[in-house]
Amino acid sequence: MNNQRHKIIEIAVAVLTAIGKIIFMDILNWRLPFISIVILGWGSYILWQRKHHPDRIIQWGFRTDNWWSVSKRVLPFALLAISSFLVIGLLNNSIQWTWHIVPILLIYPLWGILQQFLVIALVAGNLQDLDEHKQRSGSIIFITSLLFAIVHYPHAWLMGGTFLLALFYGYIFLKERNIYVLGILHGWLGALFFYTVLNRDPFSEVFAKYLN
């Protein structure tokens, strides 16, 4: 298959996955089944590409050689974001103090890595690869951030937060191409955002009906 066509198809399937998130997670409330299928499906695709086209894995950002340099670049932003979440949570009295945050902090980075793979690596990364002259990075980052925000409709705080985060993620990824650091960061920031700003408990939302 033509390489350009392949990248376009990947973008299209990533967008369809985002639409599926709205339908199955937000409308039908099939959170755990949808997350499980997405992780299994896309995880299998990543493993297949790793076996047959290992260079693509590096291109997608599954690499550790620049781990520390990327971590140093995102650390100030992470500290600023966490401080902002806590201030907003204290002002709005929206902080949830519950042990549920512990398992979410442990497992949400896996979902964060997959989200970053779909939105940042496949959409932003492929769009950059298709841009022969590499002159549209700003537009690519904006489009990707807009998509990431729309996926979180209708939650205004979540849409605003993910849009700003994606602007930063997109900028870093197009410079460094490391999905591990961005995915783990997104998982931790996302978990803290739910429990501080949104006053929501994703652990209960996803697992409660299966544990009761």
Model-derived segments and their meaning:
Residues 1-52:
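Alpha-helical transmembrane segments in multi-pass membrane proteins
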Residues 2-14, 35, 55-82, 99-108, ...:
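Interfacial transmembrane-helix boundary/kink motif in multi-pass membrane proteins
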Residues 20-28, 85-96, 202:
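Juxtamembrane "helix-exit" motif on the non-cytosolic side of transmembrane helices
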Residues 22-23, 47-56, 87-91, 172-175:
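Structural signal for the C-terminal ends of transmembrane alpha-helices
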Residues 28-37, 96-101, 156-163:
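Short, aromatic-rich membrane-interface segments at the entry and exit
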Residues 159-212:
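Functionally important transmembrane alpha-helices
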